[in-house]
Amino acid sequence: MKTNSEEQMIKLFGIPLSDKPRWQQFLICSSGFFFGYLVNGICEEYVYNRLKFSYGWYFTFAQGLVYIALIYMYGFRTKQMVNPWKTYVKLSGVLMGSHGLTKGSLAYLNYPAQIMFKSTKVLPVMVMGAFIPGLRRKYPVHEYISAMLLVIGLILFTLADAHTSPNFSIIGVMMISGALIMDAFLGNLQEAIFTMNPETTQMEMLFCSTVVGLPFLLAPMILTGELFTAWNSCAQHPYVYGVLVFEAMATFIGQVSVLSLIALFGAATTAMITTARKAVTLLLSYLIFTKPLTEQHGTGLLLIFMGIILKMVPDPNPNPKSSGSGQTPGKLERVKFEKEDDEESRPLV
């Protein structure tokens, strides 16, 4: 076993993070995440709403190809892998299942209903963390309350601007619930991989997940005919590919930043950050376009800020397996499997 000084350090595009103070780690990773997904939102608004191109599977496939090219340019090669391919087969299966169920649920749920469900993502992430072998995270009560405040606040803020009420369908509810469970499993599985094998890099996880995941996209594209329709439409408007490449480059920064957050702070904290990002994006749209803010908007914002502040309260009884703090500061520590019970020592995949 390697000593702490020999352990792999987490880096974000060459910036060493493991030896920095926690607040600097958080600021750097969050900034990369917010930048990437703010650009992503602008590009999606342009492509989906302005150009009326709703080819989600095809665009995701194109984005994956850009990811692979960028990671290859960054210098990653498969010989640098420290995890077996089967790890990423399961990871990609969950990822594509979540994407498919979320996309499919739109046929049965209207936008406000889907927002309500997707906003609760942080809660199943926290619950699922207790059942992942090698992770077994337990969170203090105040973190559950913090997550609830954040979720309720975001729902109130979002629905304040909804022109229609949430419309529920049992099939849609089952699909979006399945997507949430897969999302929860995905984040915790990524955290467990980083925890059980600290030499895992963000580039390895993103590259392997993308390479394994792309074939999963071919079946729905071919079966729905989207592959040929999207190809013909984009051939008539080739500038769309320029937008897609630019968006993929930005979201690449966001994705690597998210994986860094998971490795350093854990899946639950990362889920709270991604949830808070939605609130920040919505608030910016109101400030930039000077939309009127109602009392319900104010109530939602108040609950969101209360949840964020409560999240910052330190745990009075710290436990290495509790909270969503991810890896310890400084050099990453390996999980000592010999000190775990049989269930904890069971292979992750």
Swiss-Prot record:
InterPro entries: SCL35B1-4/HUT1. Belongs to the nucleotide-sugar transporter family. UDP-galactose:UMP antiporter (TC 2.A.7.11) subfamily. The chain crosses the membrane at residues 23-43, 56-76, 115-135, 140-160, 167-187, 205-225, 248-268, 293-313. It is found in: Membrane. Residues 316-349 are annotated as: Disordered. SUPFAM superfamilies: Multidrug resistance efflux transporter EmrE. This is UDP-galactose/UDP-glucose transporter 4. Its main location: membrane.
